[in-house]
Structures are given as structure tokens and as C-alpha cells.
């Protein structure tokens, strides 16, 4: 990744982390909706994980720990499956209970945050895969 592109990714991950943690606090304190809060908080944690991935890339830490990137890809796939299951569950519950789209306590917002969690899980896996490919190529060349 180019130097400007990596810093854009760092900024985007930071913004995602702040928004996710804000959703966690707001839906716990103001709306008393734990499911939306949980999915918002999980989205923030995955954004934080993506941020850590970028920072470790900038500090050139991944060169010596490619197994860590493999672990991050595994975690990404687990949380992707969890997010898809949560999305389907929340949409189903919203339809069955005939909830309003504009109600802040509806399961539709939980489904939205489940989708955001899926997005961050996918991005974590994508970034980990790209960094692993980059450093795997470099480590092959350094063996000669």
C-alpha cells in the first residue's frame, strides 16, 4: 500500500472505532437496547482490530510474525459468520414483530449494526490477507 493510502485506512479505521463505541454507549445508556449496543460495540472492536493491523504494518511488525496475520484472517471469518447470523436473526425478528423502521429500539437498527460488523470483519480479513501476501513475497526473496 502506498503511504497516503495507508494513512487513509488508519483514519477510516479510527473513525469506525469511534462511531462503533459511540453506538455502544448511546444504545446502552439512552435507548436501553442491548442488542444494538452489542453489535455497535463489536463493530467498534473490529474497527480497532483493523486499526491495530494498520499500525503494526506501519511499524513493520508483521514481517516477523506472519502467523499473527493468519490468526487475524481466522478471527475475521469467525466474526463474519457471526455477523451474518445476527443480521438474519434481527431482520427475522423485526419482520415477525412488525417493528417500525424509525423506532430506535427496533431490531432493524441491530441488523444495520450487524451489517457494519460484517463490513469490519471483512475489512480486517482483507487487510490481513493483503499484508500477509506482501510480507510473504518479501520473506521468500530474503531466503536467497
From Swiss-Prot:
Stored Pfam families: HRG
Motif (Di-leucine motif): 140-141
Signal peptide: none
Keywords: Cytoplasmic vesicle, Endosome, Lysosome, Membrane, Transmembrane, Transmembrane helix, Transport
Reactions that this protein is recorded to catalyse: heme b(in) = heme b(out)
Record's bilayer topology term: Multi-pass membrane protein
GO function terms (MF aspect): heme binding; heme transmembrane transporter activity
UniProt keyword Plastid, yes or no: no
A GO CC term assigned to this protein in UniProt: phagocytic vesicle membrane
Positions of transmembrane segments: 6-26, 38-58, 71-91, 107-127
The keyword Transmembrane belongs to this UniProt entry's keyword annotation: yes
InterPro entries for this protein: HRG
GO BP annotation list: heme transport
Compartments where located: Endosome membrane; Lysosome membrane; Cytoplasmic vesicle, Phagosome membrane
Family designation: Belongs to the HRG family.
PANTHER family cross-referenced by the UniProt entry: HEME TRANSPORTER HRG1
Task of the protein: Heme transporter that regulates intracellular heme availability through the endosomal or lysosomal compartment. In macrophages, is the heme transporter for heme-iron recycling. Essential for macrophage iron homeostasis, transports heme from the phagolysosome to the cytoplasm during erythrophagocytosis (EP).
Protein's recorded name: Heme transporter hrg1-B
Provenance organism: Danio rerio (Zebrafish)
